[in-house]
Swiss-Prot record:
Role played: Controls the stability of the leptin mRNA harboring an AU-rich element (ARE) in its 3' UTR, in cooperation with the RNA stabilizer ELAVL1. Decreases the stability of the leptin mRNA by antagonizing the function of ELAVL1 by inducing its atypical recruitment from the nucleus to the cytosol. Binds to cardiolipin (CL), phosphatidic acid (PA), phosphatidylinositol 4-phosphate (PtdIns(4)P) and phosphatidylserine (PS).
Region (Disordered): 1-30, 327-357, 371-431, 443-473, 493-610
SUPFAM superfamilies: PH domain-like (SSF50729)
Signal peptide coordinates: none
Positions of the PH domain: 96-192, 227-324
Protein name (Swiss-Prot/TrEMBL): Probable pleckstrin homology domain-containing family N member 1
Processing after translation: Phosphorylation is essential for its mitochondrial localization and regulates its interaction with C1QBP.
Gene name in the database record: Plekhn1
Disruption phenotype: Male knockout mice (KO) gradually become fat after 20 weeks of age compared to the wild-type (WT) mice. At 36 weeks, weight differences in whole body, epididymal fat pad, and liver between the KO and WT mice is significant. KO mice exhibit a hyperphagia phenotype with the plasma concentration of leptin higher in the KO mice than in the WT mice.
Length: 610
């Protein structure tokens, strides 16, 4: 047939129209050159891609340098963010923490540009707002920035210094917006362990400090404040039963929650104190847990690691809430461990102070004993100023009504007659309860031991009922005369009638075996109240708690004084309103008796205040 070379061929420049297989290599090269021209990394010599430079405004791309932009694209701040030109898409920066429209101005410059500023967990993202819409300005990492508010300026601005040719001023529209920006910037930079501004004080060595000591939050460097309380707790988001190990940090205006990760602390959330309140009264309350409640959150149960942490948290929360005027948690009376001035209502014959003495004047707070309040528990630690010790050397001194109580039995008595409402006072130092000293009372001690025992504070609790030994030598008949019998009893005057507390009368029986009985001289006779109608067999037991230094009573003491009630009682005048009785000097049966003037015996028994 012939050779193909003999067939006439079209010109070489026209062969492309007859080609069935286009060149793949040529297409790849043409596409690469076109994309490079669009993104500005390679400019053609003919410059026909100037119209395609609109792709420079796509956010998240790698913006070329200003040497590839001879034309003015209305981006005056484009050249200052070279440090922020990372190949990092915006979607990989995390969630937006805070954003708003601000104005940017370099220091010592008058050019101001509107800009949208977005704060990510570790970056600041700038977008310019112009005629073309939002355009990418730059991306600055927080690790290379320093934030500091401007002082003495009328503008609501803060200053950013870092990888910039000059400090950059960010102008906010209001003071509230400035506070929000400073708050979020300070918090994010604190979470990264950074120093916030040039004027911030040095942190110093943190080698032996817990990691949360670096956590700070503030509304500026001038008002910077640190964490008040921090501890490891377990958090339970009700109604879920799962508990998480967290680090709870209390700041002056918020509660921050962190988790301890291998790479450091991870921020979990923050609760403003103005939006939450602490609940200590829950049905399933543990001994060291409390609830955090709020209208916009699920109830959170906080379980402290120890009771000491629990008490410290409650104390710090009450202190911060009281200062800020927020919702106060319940007072210390709702939980043990914290003490506060309290008001107690007691019933019984008297109230005991912390040193074992009773007070009729009730000028200091007195805590009722377990017998006075059978349904309540007795506090383990109490403390308040002890009443002064009465002078025992002056026989004419008016008694202050303070006496030392001996162990008394727990038999029923008319305690419902007196109801006291004692107003509390500040508790300076708690006085620990010591029941071991109750057994150290020496009933047959001399005056030296008596004076020494007055200085030793004893427990306000009653000890076990005192049972006198059968071999006791001291009998009620050993006392010759009622005056010496009264001197053996450490009594106190009747309560001030102007006081709101009703009086409680106690019978003092008189034995018929004592001859020549005389009443105590002076105002004693004018301070005797009317006798009770019937004899109470508990009167002798009640005297055992009021004896200061007399010997132990025999077991048949009630039988000795029973005949005293057989006589017809005599009517005695009531006590005057403002006259205080003066008692004779207390004496012990084991010591010489002082001579007392004799007076005619008074028929019947006397009613004596104890």
């Amino acid at each position: 047939m012939g050779n193909s070379h003999c067939v006439p061929q079209a010109p070489r420049r026209l062969r492309a129209s007859f080609s069935r297989k286009p060149s793949l290599k040529g297409n790849r090269e043409d596409s690469a050159r076109k994309l490079a021209g669009l993104f500005g990394t390679e400019a053609r010599p003919d410059g026909d891609t100037a119209a395609n430079r609109i792709f420079h405004y796509i956010p998240g791309t790698d913006i070329p340098g200003p040497e590839h932009h001879p034309e003015n694209l209305e981006q005056p701040f484009l050249s200052v963010f070279k440090k922020g030109w990372r190949r990092t898409p915006v979607r990989n920066l995390g969630k937006v923490v805070h954003y708003s429209k601000v104005r940017l101005r370099f220091q010592h410059s008058q050019d101001i540009s509107d800009c949208y500023l977005e704060l990510f967990p570790s970056h600041l993202y700038f977008q310019a707002h112009g005629s073309e819409g939002l355009t990418f300005q730059g991306l600055l990492p927080l690790t290379e920035l320093n934030i500091c508010p401007t002082d003495g300026s009328r503008e609501h601005a803060f200053q950013i210094t870092g990888p910039l040719p000059a400090p950059l001023l960010v102008l906010c529209h209001s003071e509230a917006e400035l506070s929000h920006w400073l708050y979020h910037l300070e918090k994010q930079m604190a979470l990264l362990g950074l120093q916030r501004c040039h004027s911030a004080p040095p942190q110093g060595s943190l080698g032996d400090k817990p990691p949360w000591t670096q956590l700070r939050r503030a509304y500026g460097c001038g008002s910077m404040s640190g964490a008040i309380c921090a501890s490891r707790v377990k958090l339970q988001h009700l109604p879920s039963q799962e508990q998480w190990d967290r680090l709870l940090v209390l700041y002056p205006a918020s509660l921050a929650i962190f988790s301890e990760e291998p790479e450091g602390l991870s921020f979990k959330g923050e609760l403003p104190l103005s939006a939450i309140h602490i609940n200590l009264e829950e049905k399933e309350k543990e001994i060291r847990s409390f609830l955090i409640e709020g209208h916009l959150i699920n109830t959170i149960r906080v379980v402290c690691a120890s009771y000491e942490d629990y008490s410290q948290w409650l104390l710090c929360l009450r202190t911060v809430s009281r200062r800020d005027g927020a919702h106060l948690p319940p007072g210390p009376e709702s939980f043990p461990g914290l003490q506060k001035p309290t008001q107690l209502v007691g019933r019984g014959r008297g109230s005991l102070s912390s040193n074992g003495r009773s007070s009729w004047k009730l000028e200091c707070p007195v805590f009722p004993t377990s017998q006075s309040l059978p349904e309540s528990s007795v506090p383990t630690t109490i403390g308040f100023p002890a009443p002064p010790v009465p002078n025992q050397t002056d026989s004419n001194c008016v008694s202050t009504g303070q006496k030392k109580m001996k162990p008394s039995d727990s038999s029923p008595s008319p305690r419902g007659r007196a109801q006291r409402e004692v107003s509390g006072s500040t508790v300076p130092l708690p006085l620990p309860l010591d029941l071991t000293k109750m057994s150290a009372l020496n009933l047959d001690s001399g005056p030296e031991a008596q004076d020494h025992s007055l200085d030793i504070p004893h427990s306000p609790l009653y000890a076990d009922p005192y049972t006198p030994p059968a071999t006791s030598r001291h009998k009620i008949t050993d006392i010759q005369g009622l005056d010496e019998f009264l001197c053996a009893i450490q009594t106190s005057p009747g309560p001030d009638l102007s006081s709101p507390f009703p009086p409680v009368s106690v019978s003092v029986p008189v034995s018929e075996s004592s001859s020549g009985i005389s009443s105590s001289p002076g105002p004693l006779g004018s301070h005797l109240l009317t006798k009770k109608g019937a004899l109470q067999p508990r009167a002798s037991q009640r005297h055992r708690g009021s004896f200061k230094s007399r010997g132990p009573q025999p077991s048949d003491f009630p039988q000795l004084v029973t005949p005293a009630r057989e006589g017809k009682p005599s009517s005695l005048p009531p006590p005057p309103d403002e006259e205080a009785p003066i008692w004779n000097k207390t004496s012990s049966p084991s010591h010489p008796k002082w001579p007392q003037p004799r007076k005619p015996a008074v028929e019947g028994g006397f009613i004596q205040w104890i």
